[in-house]
Amino acid sequence: MDLRPGARFCDRCGTKVEKICPACGAVLRDQARFCDLCGVPLEGAAPVSRPKAQKGGIAAGQLHTVAFRADGKVLVTGNNDFGQCDVGGWSDVVGVACGKDFTVAVRADGTALATGNNQFGQCDLSGWTNLIAVACGETHTVGLRSDGTVLATGRDAKAQVGKWENITAVDAGMDHTLGLCKDGTAVAAGQGMFGTCAVEHWQDITAIAAGHMHSLGLRKDGRLLQADGFIAPGVLDWTDLTAVAVGPYHTVAVKQDGTVVASGDIQHGQCQVETWTNVRTVAAGERHTVALCADGRVLAVGDDSAGQCDVTEWKLW
């Protein structure tokens, strides 16, 4: 977000601007001269904005589906063996993400909420602030801060992203993490067992998607790039794309005309999206696919063994 020096509100969207301490990351009064937390002088401190409230959004885990409404409330359906669906008290949510069996959300004040399996500390987000987005891998969580830096927690997560800067989006796969850079390139960290981290040649990227065994980048021209490794048949031939999501074994994308294409494992019907229209974005679970339509309706197809596709009554705005 480009701001005039000393601006208190964004000229474009009206979001209130505050200051962030360059030493400890604390968010401060916009007129503060010293950090209230660590005492560092704040002359030249970078202005940051809170995450802008969205109309709504969706996320898909292994056996559960989550969405947030325009009023900041959260909807959830599916398996709750680890408490991943215990979101009843959540409010002011502006973003959600699902891991295998846990759920994470960003609140309007830039903090995070988490519930579900915490075996590897993937839900230990109590100290996270200044967030604008989150992403979940199978057993780790990644948070994007308003200054373009990235936080991570969970199995083998913290050392992966600590030096990243100028990041505008993040996504997480089974054992790797992707970051979209401001200049349209991408970075990756993690095991890269199947070549999932081979993104150094990517350019002109507008969105990223991390799966179990593959990584995809959506280019400005509406086509996809892949990292080395597994890729679903025909995906690189798709055109006119505006959004992409990947599950462990299937890939889903939205086209400019609001229709949806899918490829990969079809055993549970997760790729039966040919009749969908007016779709804005998609999410891919392990064996199911979810879509958010432009009118606020939510669609789902695939494995419904835990009720993860029971979204017919959902309306996000």
Q: What are these language model-derived features?
A:
Residues 63-64, 68, 75-89, 101, ...:
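Short glycine/serine- and acidic-residue-enriched loop/turn motifs that recur at repeat junctions
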Residues 51-68:
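Beta-strand-rich domains and repeat architectures in extracellular enzymes and scaffolds
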Residues 70-73, 91, 107-113, 129-133, ...:
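Thr-biased low-complexity repeat/linker tracts and other Thr-enriched repetitive architectures
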Residues 93, 131-132, 167-168, 205-206, ...:
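Repeated scaffold domains used in trafficking and secretory/extracellular systems
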